[in-house]
Amino acid sequence: MVLIRVLANLLVLHLSYAQKSSELVIGGDECNINEHPFLALMYNSTSMKFHCSGTLLNEEWVLTAAHCDMENMQIYLGVHDKKNPNKDQQTRVPKEMFFCLSNKSYTPWDKDIMLIRLNSPVTYSTHIAPFSLPSSPPTVGSVCRIMGWGAITSPNETYPDVPHCANIEIYDYSVCRKAYGGLPEKSRTLCAGVLQGGIDTCLADSGGPLICNGQFQGIVAWGRHPCAQPQLPAFYTKVFDYSDWIQSIIAGNTAATCPS
């Protein structure tokens, strides 16, 4: 697992944060096959290893985490069981990728977001449909849905063929600051999980959606490994804060900048 830390507090943060780019939902159950038509599966076409998920915004655009950037990326839409493809499953590759910063810089609490333009539009179908951007931010205490093909056990990871889903809760950012230490006072992330432990996103869930009250509110970003430990919620990029940037890029303003 790749670990990324802030230079000023390198040792502490190196022990605290881990990308969820190879994680699945711990403590969940198989998602209903009709529950995730917007969910994208992201592979390295050379190694044929699954690394991340993403969310389809419209026929041409997928939103995911910046740390999901990889060589030889293939994006699968309409997938449920990886070993038994749906008839309407479609595959695309990136045509363009957009980051908040030209040097692709991001931290566990800022700008871990990537917008991908597909090489050709997908066709909507029974198992392929978009998810709109949120109209308002989520509130503390909201119950949210997580989903993905990431690890279902940790630290000895096992990976399912079908996506798993589970419910977690939004906490005040101060809960994550207390749990991890060394975090800035403000962040464009959501703090979410189950403080009792046992339920969490995990390796290879990165880039997937956090859905609160029917709205796409977060992107799976960072958390502690092993996954699903008590008192250690995870971080999700706050989609609402980046809505203007996302809409500007999709509209053709490729010079648009992310919120500071």
UniProtKB/Swiss-Prot annotation:
Q: Which family does it belong to?
A: Belongs to the peptidase S1 family. Snake venom subfamily.
Carbohydrate-modified residues: N44, N103, N156
Cellular location(s): Secreted
Protein task: Snake venom serine protease that may act in the hemostasis system of the prey.
Taxonomic placement: Eukaryota, Metazoa, Chordata, Craniata, Vertebrata
Entry GO terms, CC:
extracellular region; secretory granule
User: Where is it made, tissue-wise?
Assistant: Expressed by the venom gland.
Cite the InterPro entries for this sequence.
Peptidase_S1_PA, Peptidase_S1_PA_chymotrypsin, Peptidase_S1A, Trypsin_dom, TRYPSIN_HIS
- Taxonomically, the superkingdom here is Eukaryota
* Annotated signal sequence range: 1-18
E.C. designation(s): 3.4.21.-
Q: What are the BP-aspect GO terms?
A: proteolysis
Its protein name is: Serine protease VLSP-1
Which terms does the record give in the GO molecular function aspect? serine-type endopeptidase activity; toxin activity
The record, for Pfam families, names: Trypsin (PF00089)
User: Which residues are annotated as active site?
Assistant: H67 (charge relay system), D112 (charge relay system), S206 (charge relay system)
- The pro-peptide lies at 19-24
Q: Which key words are in the record?
A: Disulfide bond, Glycoprotein, Hemostasis impairing toxin, Hydrolase, Protease, Secreted, Serine protease, Signal, Toxin
Q: Which residues form the Peptidase S1 domain?
A: 25-251
Q: Which residues pair up as cystines?
A: C31-C165, C52-C68, C100-C258, C144-C212, C176-C191, C202-C227
